[in-house]
Regions:
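Primarily short, surface-exposed interaction patches in extracytoplasmic proteins
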Residues: 42-44, 48-49, 99-198
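N-terminal module-boundary/linker segments of secreted carbohydrate-active enzymes
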Residues: 1-113, 117-121, 125
């Protein structure tokens, strides 16, 4: 007992509120660790403000670069091309020139830069976190020389994963199987279609 008759271990409303607030912050932080590529203060505040379920619903409702043309959102492939033009203006001088004709070794660097830009700054963080998880399951490798020099195929592959992150798995597998990056990785690019003998 204290001199005023209260028990020392009795909690006041303010300390109880502080504990509850801390628990809410910890839960929000844990969600953001799992659903994003790193919690940011604005996201933490938003999760605490609207709750975990509402934040996830909000993330699923964000427009993406794959919804409509002319929305000022860029796909990974489009962003890759912007980076390549900035890095090598003489090689990629206009919008009509073909990318990677001369197989510069830096193209996978441009793809990585485009991917990191989306992963770190896109508002729809869950989309890119799911796409990253899919990339760990449906693997193509930039370590292979032909893939490393085709950063455009890797950027397009990233787009397939991000576009289908919340969609039908069968559609995802179909697009992955037909993608240039998977064709290079599995060495079925350029194979002739099967012709039945009947």
């Amino acid at each position: 007992n204290t001199s005023d008759g209260r028990c020392e271990f009795a909690k006041t409303n303010s300390s109880q509120n502080a504990v509850e607030s801390n628990n809410q912050s910890q839960k929000a932080f844990r969600l953001l660790l799992q659903a994003t590529f790193g919690p940011q203060k604005k996201d933490l505040d938003r999760v605490i403000e609207i709750g975990e379920t509402s934040w996830i619903d909000e993330q699923l409702q964000y427009s993406s670069a794959y919804d409509a043309a002319g929305d000022n959102l860029t796909t990974n492939l489009e962003h890759y091309k912007i980076i390549a033009r900035m890095a090598e203006p003489s090689t990629y001088s206009d919008n009509t020139s073909s990318f990677n004709n001369n197989f510069h070794g830096r193209t996978s660097d441009y793809q990585s830069a485009a991917w990191f830009e989306k992963a770190l700054h896109a508002p729809d963080q869950i989309r890119y976190r799911v796409a990253f998880a899919l990339s760990e399951l449906l693997v193509v490798s930039a370590a292979k020389q032909r893939t490393r020099f085709r950063g455009d195929s890797l950027a397009y592959y990233d787009d397939i994963l991000a576009k289908n992150a919340f969609g039908n798995f069968r559609n995802l597998l179909d697009e992955v199987a037909k993608s240039p990056a998977m064709g290079i990785f599995l060495s079925h690019q350029g194979n002739k279609k099967y012709m039945s003998q009947s």
